[in-house]
Structures are given as C-alpha cells and as structure tokens.
C-alpha cells in the first residue's frame, strides 16, 4: 500500500464549525487541522516516473494554508469492506492516465487534534462526532488503512435445514436474516420446499423475502378488506385502477412498467446520429413518462446517501421504462419532525425524544437535500419542484391523544421524462437472449433494503438498518443512461429487448422480475457478475443493492453493437445468463461447483398467501380551536417561520435548475428570483413551445381529522398548482399517488381505505382524471425507549399527489409575480371553499400547538373542474397578470408571496369574506388569487360565473408600488405591515439553515441583500440587437463548419451546447474522450472545439482536473490538443466543467499563461443561480460585439471561484484585458458580494480569454439560455433567441 499526503481538506469556517461542535459537546479541543491522505493498492511497485505522475494526479482542489500536522491523529476512511464512490472514479482516472498497476485508490481524512486534556472516553466521543458511523470508520494510525484493501475468500452458500428441523429452522432464519416474513409466508415456504424435497439455501429465502416484501409486492394495496365486520368489494389497488378504467384517455402505459406513459407532442428531438455522430433534429413523438418514489427508511438512517439513492433509483425507473427512455426533470420532497434549529427554536417545537438509531429532523434537512440535489446535479437532471413539511405534536386524533409526526421521514423523489412511441411497450425476450447487468460492480452494501423498509422503525435489528444503507455514484448512472440513450436513438434497431432497473433486493429481485415479465425463465452464472468484493457470499453477491445498475435482455445478434456502445461510454456491463423456455431459475456458482438457486419461478413469484385486513373505523376527535392566546400579528410572524410556508431558497439553490436547456419554469420567479412558483414546466424539445408540467399536492395534517378530506385536498392542490399553465382539457392531467401510512396503527388502515376510495372511486372519476402510477410505504411509525417509557411517533396518513400534463405553449405559463407596470389592476380571490373557512389542521393551528376540529375539504367537485377550465380560458386568452394558489398559511400567505415576487405592495379589503378575519386569512380551503387588468375585471368575473363560480369570486383590492401590505375589513384595519418586514420573517428559516450548513458569512450576505429595498431586480442592458442573426449570410452559403462537442464520462450539458452551435450554423459532432484516446476520432478535422459542462469523473480529483490530466498524461492526445490550440484558425470554448478542464490545460494554449484555476465556491456549496453578468472588454472572439452588455445567465457549479497565485497574478490577468465576463449586482456594479457573485471570485471574474481571443473559458452556461423561454426571467420584448445566442453566431461569423 502506497500512502500519499494530499491537500488541506477543510476551509477555515468548516474548522471553526467543528471546534464549535466540540465546544457544544464539552470536548476541550484547542485546534483541528484536516488534510486528505490517499492510499494506493498496487499490483507492482511504481517507478519514479509513475510515482511522480500519481503524486501530480492527487494534487487538486483549492490551495489552502498548510502546516505540519500537530496533535493526535484520527483518520476517517470509508468502512473496510466497502468501496467509496470517490475510489471508483479516482481509480478510473488513474487507469485512463496510464497507471494500470493501481488496483484501487482510496481517500481518507486525517484530522490532527490538539486536545491534551481529553480522556479516552472523550476521544471516542470526538471520533463519533467526526464521522458518519453508517458510512465511515475511524483509525488512529495511517497503516491501519491497509484494512481498506483486505481481500477475503468467498464464503459458501448456507442451507436452512427444514427437512430436519421443520418450521423452527425457517423461523430462526427469518430473525437472523431480517426477512420480515409473515407466518403464512413461512408456512408457504415450508410447503414449497418440502414439496421440492430439499432444503432451501439462504439466498433463496432472502430472494423470496425481498421479492415478496411489502416494499416490492404492495401486499396491503392488493389485500382483501373487512371494515367494521363488512367485507369490502375492492382492493385498494383496484380502486386506483378504477380511475384508468373510467378515463383511459391519453394513457399509453399504466401499472405494468417502471413508470407510466402518457401522450406527448410531435417535436424535433435533438441527438447525434449513430453513423456520423452529427447532431440534428429528428421529428418524432416525445411521449411523457412519469414516476414518483419514496426512500424513507434509508434517509432516516443516513440522510445524504438515503436521499441520493432515492433520486438515483427513481431516475433509473424512468430510464428503464419500455425499451429505454430519457429522464428529463426531477422533484424532491421531505416530511420530517420539528427542526429545532439551535438558537432559532420555535414556540410550537417540543422535544419528544427519538431513538438513537435514526438521525434528527435537522440532520435530515441538512444532509438529505444535499444528497438528493447532488445526485440530480451530477446525473444532469434539473430538480424543479418540491415540498417541505414539518410536523411533530401530541394531538387528539382518531386514536385519542398520542404523538404524531415524521420521525420516520418521507423522502420523495420523482420526475418526468420522454420516450419514443415505438419503445413504450417492452419487447419480447427470445429464448437464448443474453441477460445483462449494465452498471457498476457488486459491493457489500444496501443488503435488505426492501425488507428493512417494510418494517416500522424499531422492529429490525440496528445492524440490519446499518446493512441497508446504500451509496451513490451518479456519474456511473450517467454513463449507463448514455448507453440507454444511444440504444433508443437507434429506433427500430434498438438492441434492448427488455429492461428493468436494479433496486430493492438487488439482482435477486431484478433478474427474476425481468425474465418473469418477459414470460421466460433464466439460467445464470454467479461468478460472471462484476464484483469488487470477491469475499462476499453468494447471498451478498446476488442480493446486495449496489446502485446504478440495470438488467437487460439483448438479442445475441445485437451483442456486438451493445458492446461497442458500452465501451465508448465506458459503462461496465456483464452477460450473466440466458433466457430459457422453462420458467425456472437456476443460478450456478462455478467457484464452489454448486447451484445456490434452483427453483421454479412460480415458487418465488407465484400465488403467495393473500393478505386480509380486518379493521375497525375510528372517528376523529380533535378539539375546537382555542383562540384566547392567538393574536393576528403574532400568528403572521409564526406562520412565516413555519417550514411548510417559509422561504425554501436553501433547498433550491443547491440544485441545478437549467441543465438540458429545456427548463422554462423553475421555482424562482421574476426579476427578484423569489421561490414561489406553483409548478415546474419544461419544453418538449429545443425547437418547440410544446412542453410538460408537473405540480405537487399534499395536505397530510388534515388526515388527523379526516382521512378522505386530506386525500381529496392533495388532489385539489395539485390541480390548483398546475392550473395556470396551458394544458387544455382536464383529462390531459395524470396523477401519481404516493401513499404513506402506519399500517396496523388503530384507525389508520380503515382511514387509508376511505382515503383511497375518496380519490379512486369518487373524486378522480368525477373529474375524469387518471392515476396511472404511484407507490406506497406502509410502515410510517417509529418506536423507542425514552427512559422507562415506551414511545411511538406515528406519521399522519400522508398522500402526496404529483400532477403531470402535456403543455400546449410553455410561453403562456402565469407566475405569482404581481405586476404594477400594467396599469390599474384588480386582485380576485376564487374561494373554492365557498365561505366554509375551516381552520382545522392548518398552519395556524400547528404554530399554536393545536389541531382544531373541522378541516378544509373539496367542497364542490363541479366547481373544482369549473375553476380549472376557467383558468385554462384565462391563460389561453392571456388575461391573467399573476396567479397563485391558496395553500399552507392561507390567503395572507398567498398575497404576501405574490407581493414578494412583484417587489410591491398590496391593499386589500376582506369584508366580503365574513366577519371572522382569522378564519378568512388563515383557512386553507382550495382556491387562488388572480391579478387581472382593471378594465378586464368585469369580463373575467363573467367568465368565472359562466363556469359556475359566481359564489366563489371576491374582489379584494389591488397591487401597488411600494412597501405596503395592508389588509382592511371595510374601514377597519385588520393587519398592516411592511412587505419588506414580512419578506425577512419569511426568509429567516432558510437563512438559519443556510448558516448551519454552508459558509455563514455568505448566508449573512444573502440575508442582508434581501433588505435592499432599492434593488431593481434582474435587468438587461444590450449593446447589440439580439434579433439580428449575424450568422445568416454564412448559413445561406450552406457551409457548416464542424465543431467538436467534447465530453468526458460525467459530462451532462453537451446536447444543449450542440443545439446552440447547430442553430448558429455549425455541424455539431459528438466527440467522447474515449474516441480520442482510442484514436477513433482526432481533432484535425475540426475548426472549433467546445468542452462542455457537467461532472467529469464526478469531480473527484478537483473539478475538471481529472479530465485535464487524462489529456496531459497521454502523450499522443496531449500533442493533438496542443496542435489544435496552436492552429491559427481554430476556436475553443470551455464552459463550466469544460472551463475548469481547459484552465488546467493552459500550458498547451497560447496566450493562456495568466489563466486562473477554478476552485471550491466561497459558500462551500453548489450554487445554482440566475446571475447578472457584464461583458468586459477583452479579445474574446466569442464576445467581440457584446462588450458593455449586461444580462442574466445560468450559473450551476460547486467549484467556480477564481484562484490566482497572488496579487501580482491577478494584476497581470487584469492588465492583459483577458477577463471576458464579470458578475455584477442588480445595480450594475461589479461585485464580490454573495449571492450576486455566487462563487466569491475576485473582481467578479467568471470568464477569461486567451491573448488572441480564440480560446475562451467561462463558468456560466450560455448554452442553457440561448432560447428566450429557457430563461428563468426575461424582458417581454425578447423573441425566440436570447442575447446569449450572439456568442455562438459570433463564432460562426469568425470562421467565415
């Protein structure tokens, strides 16, 4: 084992935070220093040259002050027996740099602790504080890291002696292996294997448990029901299917695949052809697929990997739909118990305790969103939608007074994608078809995820919880998706016959499911499975849940093509078996010469015992709202701090919202970028205004009073959230229903049945809406011992509805931004509660630790449908200036958020809403506030009346310029406050979370910036006409110069980059680094090169640095790049990851010697912003006629801060006039202040060019916003092309 020291690992503020945590834990630590240390497992000693190359490879990241480690060593590494994602990717880079004798690289974090007065118990306490016990271990000596590379002999399969010991042997195995088998399933297995005349193996039992777990089989949703002694006519699943039977319109696939599919639009899908690799538009149907999953159990145990693999698994579900599909846009949601932010605890937050085996709600909301965002970011899928609810209270619900909350959290992961018409249905698995595992190797992780997540927290052994934690490698999943993309793009020649993702249960669930769904059996070889841990037993190899894997059936004649695609994308795969005529599973193990699995498929997946739920209804209790202690002014302040209501910027700016270039509505609204969007919208392609929308609906606390009302409201809210997009008819909307329940808890089962019936049998059929997809999680309870008391925290029944729809015109989407620049205006409330104004289970009751008695509900189904249809007319006719639905916090919050988005005031009169101001302002009945022009008010009110809404419409008042927020009832002032004051209250929760998680100085700067009342918002100043196509004369000549659209594994922004160059008149050619390294392509034939954004190698050796070093350490490819850069007629552009990469190639680029490096953002966080930049005077040929222009641009990076050697280096860069772009604030002043400058770069620098101007590198993404509709905000006068299109046309003009 080689040991190589790395760079300092923690910034000053991270060390300060660590010291503060030590202080809070009463640990007398005076100083901490941390640096990376690298360990290399080598097959042969490295030569001096190889050692130097490895040393250079491992020099990465920001240049932080070094000092010799002093104090006692605590070395934090991945757990022995596991392989970290860092290791997988760093080893790939080493191999691509010619260091083939390196078997594996691993990294640790070496803490040098100065704490001379710590006793041994305190050292153990400190070690626990420094690492995640689920993922890491702590050593006290560097040599102990040798354990990371320990190799073990494979363990043999174990047999369970049922022939000798009978039922007791199965019962013991059930406990030992954590199988969560029911008694009737034990009986079933005993009968089955006795009939086969042999003892089952541990792997067969484990496989059965996973395949038949509640997680995978949905037993409760398929159960028979008896309620109050009366047999019920339908299962839960049949009631959901009733929506499809009633309204099958536009649904192409439901209930039978990894995701549902509905009709989309005929558009030009943009991708490179297989023959020539040239990008072009292909006119075809882009149907819409939809899926929403939950990943609750792993997120409670270890939030980052739990949430990350939740998003990753859902992305795989989308990609594995039909014969291969394309994930496009994602959503993430969280329900947790109270945060109790230190120093910011809220009046309603009591600490009821929790078990040690799960983390706190604060931990979940600190780490979980980062994990979900990081996976989506690295994979290259924008996360555009979400929700965040906290609930934890002692309430009087159906079962009397008890604790209700989310100690077992909800982690929601979902999204939409596109699929070709001819790939919607799975193909036929032919006998002899090759059975393939695509993706990374097996590792001993995530064992038991399906069975573990099917148990209430506290029922399973803590070691089994530990075993079910997973790890994420989104860059590997991206490689696999690129393979799937290449396959579906082949159309009828697609080599994929059948595909499933690998999720719960690993291959033990995926492979039987694959062959069974294809009507076949399978014969497999265990030792052909890619395996990074050969010491695993057969059970561990077959059943582990290593992520980023798919199982496929490929025709033998197509294997050569499939192999070629995988090699080019560097996506590992293994052929592990063949499909058989007989529906039988045979798993051979050539190492031991036996068959760990040899069983008929119908034993595994056949008629296992059907569940019967015999339950009793309980009536909700609740308590009348006690108003004595409620003051309206105090209520407003509390509600503005409630996470379900409060600003969620801290959850949003960590997630890339612009990748693909097809995002037309993200969470951030208007010139002030306020996170209040009601829904997410994407364009169907890069050449179309057709699109897709998705929205969420969720009202879980209402279930504590009325199960069915809670479910109806979830559907209603999803509809009111999506209503201000141009959809057309209501039946175009399709829903995903995710049901979370504590099955078995008194009253909950019958409540679940009533809720499903309310939606599946009544509401959705009446609205003609289908639920073609969904998921259930039936173990939402946590048990623990608190002192001598046994406690339980039970989740409310929680239905999360996601609405999906095809969009007629993405430009018609209306946002909550109030407009004061459109003349006199009117604000109208459409109250679908029709005056009921119920306050039960609202934000108001929650912040006063009450529940109330009567909740909101869908009062009139016809009016709900009429409301949607009326909004469709108003959207199509462009009569709406602003729209925002009423939800958490009620009317007051709706108006406040609209005013925040418009940076304006409101004056309203609520007299028509009744005499109870508290109920009028804080009820959460369905509805919306719309803003219309004053002169159109009468017409709008008539249209609403024509749709049956006459009794729901109330004129409130108007939006006004300024900082007022005034609510009156007739002549009485009900509430008056500055809008800016409300805005700061609303922002405080996000600010406090950001301070805890990121650089607190940056969080403080952002909070301070929100207090600038003179902020004009994003604005534009152009020195050129963006409507002028300066490339047109050259395009007319029909000469299309070739641009090499360069990507490395992990790059994810190449398609939109190719589209921008294509529009400017180039032939954009897909060039993978593997093409250059293998000599299949060279740069000789290209006049332009663009290095694209993303996460090459997952940024493990510094952003873009691994990519650059794979060029620098390969002599032939290095020479090729150097020759290209020295050719006097070439152009080169590097964006984001490509910018970082090219900055590390500056020794090859003439006139680039003053270029800086790009390192970790000052905030120490990934930053996704829509930032204002100014084009500086520089030689850049890409920006030659844009100098002086100021306009917003997409920013998405974690490592964009300019790093120079010293002040002299910065001065030389400036004096050479090589700075091409700078961040400016909304006043147009160059800035280093966060967040206007999202990465902290000196002098606002965010792009530089070479002396000749032929090579330009920039951190922001012009390719994602070259279309006007792809800008989060834009002036109304812009046409199809945004001003950033000029960059690409300048390049085309330059080439003549």
Curated annotation (Swiss-Prot):
Q: Where in the cell is it found?
A: Cytoplasm
Pathway it belongs to? Answer: Purine metabolism; IMP biosynthesis via de novo pathway; 5-amino-1-(5-phospho-D-ribosyl)imidazole from N(2)-formyl-N(1)-(5-phospho-D-ribosyl)glycinamide: step 1/2
- E.C. numbers: 6.3.5.3
**Top EC category:** ligase
Q: Which UniProt keywords apply?
A: ATP-binding, Cytoplasm, Glutamine amidotransferase, Ligase, Magnesium, Metal-binding, Nucleotide-binding, Purine biosynthesis
Catalytic activity reported:
N(2)-formyl-N(1)-(5-phospho-beta-D-ribosyl)glycinamide + L-glutamine + ATP + H2O = 2-formamido-N(1)-(5-O-phospho-beta-D-ribosyl)acetamidine + L-glutamate + ADP + phosphate + H(+)
Q: Where is the active site?
A: 1136 (nucleophile), 1261, 1263
One Gene Ontology molecular-function label: metal ion binding
A Pfam family assignment: AIRS_C
Occurrences of domain Glutamine amidotransferase type-1 (ranges): 1043-1296
Database matches in InterPro entries: Class_I_gatase-like, FGAR-AT_N, FGAR-AT_PurM_N-like, PurL_large, PurL_linker, PurM-like_C_dom, PurM-like_C_sf, PurM-like_N_sf
Instruction: Please provide the Gene Ontology terms (biological process) for this protein.
Output: 'de novo' IMP biosynthetic process
Q: How does it assemble?
A: Monomer.
Q: What does this protein do?
A: Phosphoribosylformylglycinamidine synthase involved in the purines biosynthetic pathway. Catalyzes the ATP-dependent conversion of formylglycinamide ribonucleotide (FGAR) and glutamine to yield formylglycinamidine ribonucleotide (FGAM) and glutamate.
Per the record, the similarity remark reads: In the N-terminal section; belongs to the FGAMS family.
Q: Which NCBIfam families match?
A: FGAM_synt (TIGR01735), PRK05297.1 (NF003672)
Name of the protein in question? Phosphoribosylformylglycinamidine synthase
């Amino acid at each position: 084992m080689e040991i190589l020291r790395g760079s300092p690992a923690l910034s000053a503020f991270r060390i300060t935070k660590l010291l503060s945590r030590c202080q809070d834990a009463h640990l007398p630590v005076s100083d901490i220093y941390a640096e990376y240390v690298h360990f290399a497992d080598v097959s042969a000693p490295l030569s001096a040259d190889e050692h130097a190359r490895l040393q250079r490879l491992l020099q990465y990241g920001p240049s932080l002050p070094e000092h010799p480690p002093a104090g006692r060593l605590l070395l934090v590494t991945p757990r022995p027996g596991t392989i970290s994602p860092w290791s997988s990717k760093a080893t790939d880079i080493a191999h691509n740099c010619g260091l083939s004798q390196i078997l594996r690289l691993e990294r640790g974090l070496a803490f040098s602790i100065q704490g001379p007065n710590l006793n041994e118990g305190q050292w153990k306490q400190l070690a626990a504080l420094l690492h995640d016990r689920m993922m890491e271990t702590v050593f006290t000596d560097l040599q102990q890291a040798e354990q990371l590379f320990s190799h073990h002999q494979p363990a043999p399969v174990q047999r369970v002696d049922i022939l000798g010991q009978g039922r007791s042997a199965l019962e013991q195995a059930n406990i030992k292996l954590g199988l969560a088998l029911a008694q009737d399933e034990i009986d079933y297995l005993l009968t089955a294997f006795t009939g086969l005349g042999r003892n089952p193996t541990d792997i067969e039992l484990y496989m059965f448990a996973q395949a038949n777990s509640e997680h995978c089989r949905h037993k409760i949703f398929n159960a028979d029901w008896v309620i109050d002694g009366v047999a019920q006519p339908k299962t839960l699943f049949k009631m959901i299917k009733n929506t499809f039977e009633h309204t099958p319109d536009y649904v192409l696939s439901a209930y039978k695949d990894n995701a549902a599919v509905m009709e989309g639009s005929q558009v030009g899908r943009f991708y490179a052809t297989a023959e020539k690799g040239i990008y072009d538009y292909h006119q075809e149907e882009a149907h819409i697929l939809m899926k929403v999953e939950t990943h609750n159990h792993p997120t409670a145990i270890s939030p980052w990997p739990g949430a990350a693999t939740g998003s990753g698994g859902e992305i795989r579900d989308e990609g594995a739909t039909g014969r291969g599909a394309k994930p496009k846009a994602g959503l993430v949601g969280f329900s947790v118990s109270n945060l109790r932010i230190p120093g910011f605890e809220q009046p309603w937050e009591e600490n009821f305790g929790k078990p040690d085996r799960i983390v706190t709600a604060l931990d979940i909301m600190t780490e979980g969103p980062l994990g979900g965002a990081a996976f989506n970011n690295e994979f290259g899928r924008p996360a555009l939608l979400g929700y965040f609810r906290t609930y934890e209270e002692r309430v009087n619900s159906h079962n009397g007074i008890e604790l209700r909350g989310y100690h077992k959290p909800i982690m929601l992961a979902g999204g939409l994608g596109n699929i070709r018409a001819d790939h919607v249905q799975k193909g036929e698995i032919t006998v002899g078809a090759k059975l393939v595992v695509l993706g990374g190797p097996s590792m001993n992780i995530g064992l038991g995820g399906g069975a573990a997540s099917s148990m209430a927290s506290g029922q399973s052994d803590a070691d089994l919880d530990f075993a079910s934690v997973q790890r994420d490698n989104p860059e590997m999943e991206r490689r696999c998706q690129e393979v799937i993309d290449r396959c579906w793009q082949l159309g009828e020649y697609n080599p994929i016959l059948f595909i499933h993702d690998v999720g719960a249960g690993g291959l033990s669930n995926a492979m039987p499911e694959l062959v069974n769904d294809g009507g076949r059996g399978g014969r497999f070889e265990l030792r052909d499975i890619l395996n990074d841990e050969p010491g695993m037993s057969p059970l561990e190899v077959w059943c582990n849940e290593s992520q980023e894997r798919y199982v496929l059936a490929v025709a033998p004649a197509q294997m050569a093509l499939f192999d070629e695609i995988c090699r080019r994308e560097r996506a590992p795969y293994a052929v592990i078996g063949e499909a058989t005529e007989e529906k039988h599973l045979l798993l051979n193990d050539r190492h031991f010469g036996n068959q760990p699995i040899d069983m008929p498929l119908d034993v595994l997946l056949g008629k296992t015992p059907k569940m019967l739920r015999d339950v009793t209804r309980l009536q909700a209790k609740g308590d009348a709202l006690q108003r004595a202690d409620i003051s309206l002014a105090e209520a407003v302040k509390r509600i503005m701090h409630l996470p379900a209501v409060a600003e969620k910027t801290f959850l949003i700016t960590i997630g890339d919202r612009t990748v693909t270039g097809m995002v037309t509505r993200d969470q951030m609204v208007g010139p002030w970028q306020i996170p209040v969007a009601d829904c997410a919208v994407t364009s169907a392609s890069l050449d179309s205004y057709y699109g897709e929308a998705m929205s969420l609906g969720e009202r879980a606390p209402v279930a504590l009073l009325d199960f069915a009302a809670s479910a109806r409201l979830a559907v209603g809210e999803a509809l009111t959230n999506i209503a201000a997009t141009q959809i057309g008819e209501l039946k175009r909307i399709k829903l995903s229903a995710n049901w979370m329940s504590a099955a078995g808890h008194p009253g909950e089962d019958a409540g679940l049945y009533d809720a499903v019936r309310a939606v599946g049998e009544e509401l959705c059929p009446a609205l003609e809406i289908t639920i073609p997809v969904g998921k259930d999680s039936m173990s939402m309870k946590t048990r623990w011992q608190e002192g001598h008391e046994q406690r339980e925290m039970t989740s409310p029944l929680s239905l999360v509805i996601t609405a999906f729809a095809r969009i007629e015109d993405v430009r018609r989407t209306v946002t909550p931004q109030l407009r004061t620049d459109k003349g006199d205006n009117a604000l109208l409330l459409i109250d679908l509660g029709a005056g009921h104004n119920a306050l039960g289970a609202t934000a108001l009751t929650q912040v006063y630790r009450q529940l109330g008695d009567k909740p909101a509900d869908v009062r009139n189904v016809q009016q709900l449908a009429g409301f949607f249809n009326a909004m469709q007319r108003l959207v199509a006719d462009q009569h709406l200036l602003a729209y925002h639905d009423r939800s958490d916090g009620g009317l007051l919050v709706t108006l406040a958020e609209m005013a925040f988005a418009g940076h304006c005031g409101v004056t309203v009169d609520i007299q028509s809403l009744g005499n109870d101001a508290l109920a009028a302002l804080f009820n959460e009945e369905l509805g919306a506030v719309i803003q219309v022009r004053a002169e159109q008010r009468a017409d709008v009110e008539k249209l609403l009346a024509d749709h049956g809404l006459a009794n729901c419409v109330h004129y409130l008042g108007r939006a006004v310029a300024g900082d007022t927020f005034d609510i009156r009832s007739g002549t009485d002032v009900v509430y008056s406050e500055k809008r800016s004051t409300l805005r700061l209250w609303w922002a405080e929760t996000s600010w406090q979370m950001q301070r805890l998680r990121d650089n607190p100085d940056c969080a403080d700067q952002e909070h301070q910036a929100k207090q600038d009342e003179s902020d004009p918002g994003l604005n534009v100043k152009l020195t050129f006409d963006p409507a002028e196509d300066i490339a047109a004369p050259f395009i007319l000549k029909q000469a299309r110069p070739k641009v090499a659209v360069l990507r490395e594994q992990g790059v994810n922004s190449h398609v939109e980059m190719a589209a921008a160059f294509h529009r400017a008149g180039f032939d954009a050619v897909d060039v993978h680094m593997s093409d250059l390294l293998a000599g299949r392509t060279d740069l000789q034939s290209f006049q332009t090169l663009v290095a694209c954004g993303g996460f090459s190698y997952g940024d493990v050796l510094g952003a873009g640095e691994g990519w650059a070093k794979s060029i620098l350490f390969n002599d032939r490819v290095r020479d090729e790049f150097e020759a290209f850069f020295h050719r006097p007629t070439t152009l080169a552009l590097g964006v984001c990851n490509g910018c970082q990469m090219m900055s590390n190639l500056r020794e090859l680029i003439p006139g680039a010697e003053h270029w800086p490096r790009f390192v970790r953002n000052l905030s120490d966080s990934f930053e996704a912003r829509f930032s204002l930049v100014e084009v500086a005077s520089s030689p850049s040929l890409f920006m030659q006629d844009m100098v002086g222009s100021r306009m917003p641009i997409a920013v998405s990076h974690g490592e964009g801060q300019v790093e120079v050697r010293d002040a002299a280096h910065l001065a030389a860069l400036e004096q050479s006039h090589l700075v091409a772009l700078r961040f400016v604030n909304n006043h147009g002043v160059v800035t280093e202040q966060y967040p206007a400058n999202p990465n902290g770069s000196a002098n606002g620098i965010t792009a530089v060019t070479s002396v000749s101007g032929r090579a330009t590198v920039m951190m922001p993404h012009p390719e994602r916003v070259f279309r006007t509709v792809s800008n989060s905000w834009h002036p109304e006068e812009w046409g199809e092309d945004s001003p950033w299109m000029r960059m690409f046309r300048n390049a085309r003009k330059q080439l003549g």
